Amino acid sequence: MVGFKTLALHLAAVLPALAAPVDKQATQVVPNSYIITLKQGASAASFHNHLSWVGDVHRRSVSKRDTTGVDKVFDLDGFTAYSGSFDAATLQEIKKSDEVAFVEPDQVWDLYTLSTQSGAPWGLGSISHRKPNSTDYVYDPAGLGADHYAYIIDTGLDTEHVEFEGRGTLGYNAYPNSQFIDKIGHGTHVAGTIAGKTYGVAKKASIVSVRVFDTGSVTRQSTTAIVLDGFSWAVKDITAKGRQAKSVISMSLGGGRSEAFNAAVEAAYQANILTVAAAGNSAWDASQYSPASAPNAITVGAIDVDNVMAWFSNYGPVVDVFAPGVAVESAWIGSSHAEHDVLDGTSMATPHVSGLVLYLKSLEGFASAAAVTDRIKALGTNDVVTGLEGTDSPNLIAFNGVTA
């Protein structure tokens, strides 16, 4: 049953912006927790030696107190980093290392979802028609996404939901001591828009769930390091299975701008793994947030049924395209495994574009991340979004190219 859902997870992220996002994010730093990115070209041996050195420095520090040292390690082709909890003395030694490119604080990340009431699933009509207010989804059956994969970095997935017809799998849980299940609903809703049999853009695509939000958190928040852990797993899994040309990473979440996370997104892009990211719900410049600000992510803002930019949507030149993000109906969690509900947010706009990536990959056979990005921008409907005045945003709506 479609009903009213409250998933406004962090009020500061959904209210109209009255101050610069730097001020908004200032209270979102995880105490004593940092992400350290090494300079490009670090060998496996030098990385191992660096980590050993950090461990020694931390153990010798008389002021380490409750800090735990290195916690997570991130090792992708073109991106080498680690996260952990360090005292000031250890951190200072790390910063002085010639091997270190930059150090940044770990930050709190949020899901980009708001509250809404019942409505119609108009989003599929929007991406298959140039004119607004269509509720018919027109598509080429060859673009349904069979043998293609959506890696959804989110809250988990109801794999038994009827929308997914057995195409959903549980890939990686960044909270190993917590059950791999979607008790929040956000990840299931996103997955339904990408690949659900009723609500999905790419209705036959497979779903790989990467869980980076814990159900035990009242505020439903995560951190840069935890999300980066899930992202790194997804990149490695795609690479190991040779799925670069058949996959997309979908991220309906974000936090304060992170150079480390943006570097990881770029490393994935250079390996032909495309990331689609939500612009954010702060009604502010998306360049202040990650992964929205990653240069080669496809960053998605939200519009309503009349092609008006949503009041909450982040904006600016880092946004690549707009998509339906107001009153979006999709799959939801529940004991019947057949629930559905309606939500607002750039979280809801993003999976429309993630699904479109898989649709175009399966239909037109794009092998590179750059090629499918260019195709989405070329197909988009130009100059029909209103409410963009003064935002320096592209006036472009995602479109699948089927109708005139």
From Swiss-Prot:
PROSITE patterns in the record: SUBTILASE (PS51892), SUBTILASE_ASP (PS00136), SUBTILASE_HIS (PS00137), SUBTILASE_SER (PS00138)
- Which stretches make up the Inhibitor I9 domain? 33-111
Q: Name one GO molecular function term.
A: serine-type endopeptidase activity
Propeptide, residue positions? 20-112
Glycan attachment points? N133
Q: Which PANTHER family match?
A: ALKALINE PROTEASE 1-RELATED, PEPTIDASE S8
Record-annotated disulphide pairs = none
Class in the EC hierarchy, top level:
hydrolase
- Transmembrane regions: none
Which InterPro entries does the protein's record reference? PCSK9_ProteinaseK-like, Peptidase_S8/S53_dom, Peptidase_S8/S53_dom_sf, Peptidase_S8_Asp-AS, Peptidase_S8_His-AS, Peptidase_S8_Ser-AS, Peptidase_S8_subtilisin-like, Peptidase_S8_subtilisin-rel
Where does the Peptidase S8 domain lie? 121-404
Species in which this protein is naturally found: Magnaporthiopsis poae (Kentucky bluegrass fungus)
Q: What is the taxonomic lineage of the source species?
A: Eukaryota, Fungi, Dikarya, Ascomycota, Pezizomycotina
| A Pfam family reported for this protein in Swiss-Prot or TrEMBL | Peptidase_S8
- Is Hydrolase included in the keywords of this UniProt record? yes
What does the record give as the active site? D154, H186, S347
Q: What is this protein called?
A: Subtilisin-like proteinase Mp1
Cellular compartment(s) = Secreted
**GO term, biological process aspect, one:** proteolysis
Q: Which family does it belong to?
A: Belongs to the peptidase S8 family.
Gene Ontology CC entries for this record: extracellular region
